[in-house]
Amino acid sequence: MTEVTALVTGTSRGIGAAIAAALRGRGVRVIGHATRAVDDETIAADFAEPSSPQLVWEEAIDLADGNIDILINNAGLFEANPLDVSDIQWLDSWEDTLRINLTSAAQLSRFAVKHWLAEGTGGRIVHIASRAGHRGDSPDHWHYAAAKGAMLALHKTIARAYAADGILSYAITPGFTDTAMAGDYLASRGGGGLLADIPLGRVASPQEIAAIALFCALDAPPSMTGATLDANGASYVR
């Protein structure tokens, strides 16, 4: 049986770590990515650097002996960018967030699509977007909402363009998830009030999001390509 290999970005913690564990539990070889490498199967790179996505892809292809079947775009940055900071601070934060949350995903998706077209094999991309891509975010997070909304447009475009080639694209839009990134924000905004906006009464766990990603990566039927799966405790219902 041919080994299935996945490249997953942002695997050091939270959703990315849970996705990597879930895939490995199904026998998938996972090549991870983090700002700092933790093992021989994790590639270290800072996606704020424009050249990093290409270097990650090339190293992943080498580690995988030329065969990557699944790409999961999970790496992300969620930092406040208030209106009253200096103009240059606001712009720097905007550009860093879009580069890490959107541009790196677009670059890696491009490399993956080109690879699968050349090999004639097909493949799957799973984009970890956000509820913010649908309904917007706080006044301090224009950049995050814009990046995640654009990721959804990227996902739909890939799905429509390459379905006939066996290249499938799925997106997941979590609401608040129990990660360090979201936890700091919940605490700063008064977590109880925000939880009141979630009919389920709690945030999602990383393992719940990982279960959806696992389904998209391995089990979702091809006819679902282009689908966006929400996981927000009914805090935003489309």
Where are these regions (language model features)?
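Conserved mid-core segment of classical short-chain dehydrogenase/reductases
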Residues: 77-95, 139-143, 183-186
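Short, small/polar-rich loop/turn modules that mediate ligand/substrate recognition or access, typified
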Residues: 163, 168, 224-226
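Catalytic loop of short-chain dehydrogenase/reductase
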Residues: 117, 126-150, 155-164
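A short, exposed helix-loop element centered on a Lys and neighboring polar residues
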Residues: 109-110, 156
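Short C-terminal tail/terminal secondary-structure segment
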Residues: 78, 214, 225-238
